[in-house]
Amino acid sequence: MSVAFVPDWLRGKAEVNQETIQRLLEENDQLIRCIVEYQNKGRGNECVQYQHVLHRNLIYLATIADASPTSTSKAME
């Protein structure tokens, strides 16, 4: 199960920290490797579920980055 999956009743209550982000990045690395492996074996249709999880993780990370006021100010320094 993806780290980014949070039930509706828990949304907005989880604290996002560096450890959570790192776990998501590591999970994305594994998902990409799995997707590539399936595609190389000619089984692209079977990796759709992994592509969905990867997409959800990327959207979640982008949302965190957009909501973080420190990411913009640190990048400009």
From Swiss-Prot:
Residues spanned by motif SH2-binding: 50-53
Protein name according to UniProt: SS18-like protein 2
InterPro entries from the UniProt entry: SS18_N (IPR007726)
Family per record: Belongs to the SS18 family.
Highest taxon in the source lineage: Eukaryota
Gene: SS18L2
Entries under Pfam families matching the protein: SSXT
